[in-house]
Design a protein with these regions (language model features):
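AMP-binding adenylation
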Residues: 1-150
Length: 150
């Protein structure tokens, strides 16, 4: 959106943080969207909204991982197949992510299914409800993840 014509000034809005790199993996939105499309194609389901956050220090001492919070309009036929396909799709597109998985720095992603309306309620709680406001899909921290309520 233009905010000034003299001098020219444009404000970029929307999803401007299109990456996650908490572990040096540099995963970008395009890779996430393509892997998600592959998972839906193979396992079925319809995704309403999602966000991905790193779990850097899991409580049980396990390896860190990416946690996907997904609101499904329709659940996949097999959530495990969905998760495997999603992870394999990311590894196929992003060699850094693949190296971290194979090197046992990260474990495979984990999916947390959230009820319908979770992201709408989150956006309302942030004062960002409306057509021009979008859920951030990728984050290097857990600010969104830790504020989701269900």
């Amino acid at each position: 959106m233009f905010t000034s014509l003299s001098p020219y000034r444009i404000v970029v809005t929307g999803r401007i943080k299109h990456f996650i790199s908490a572990f040096g993996e540099h995963v970008i939105a395009k890779e996430v969207e393509e892997a998600l499309a592959q998972a839906i194609s193979k396992a079925g389901g319809e995704v309403s909204e999602f966000t991905v956050a790193p779990q850097v220090n899991p409580a049980s001492g396990e390896l860190p991982y990416h946690e996907w919070f997904i609101e499904f309009e329709k659940l996949p036929e097999d959530i495990e197949t969905f998760a495997n396909t999603l992870d394999q799709g990311l590894q196929a597109q992003n060699s850094y992510y693949k190296d971290l998985i194979e090197g046992k720095i990260l474990q495979r992603l984990k999916i947390t299914c959230v009820p319908k309306g979770t992201f709408v309620e989150y956006m309302k709680s942030q004062g960002k409800f409306g057509g021009q406001n979008k859920v951030q899909h990728l984050s290097n921290d857990r600010k969104i993840a830790d504020n989701l309520k269900w």
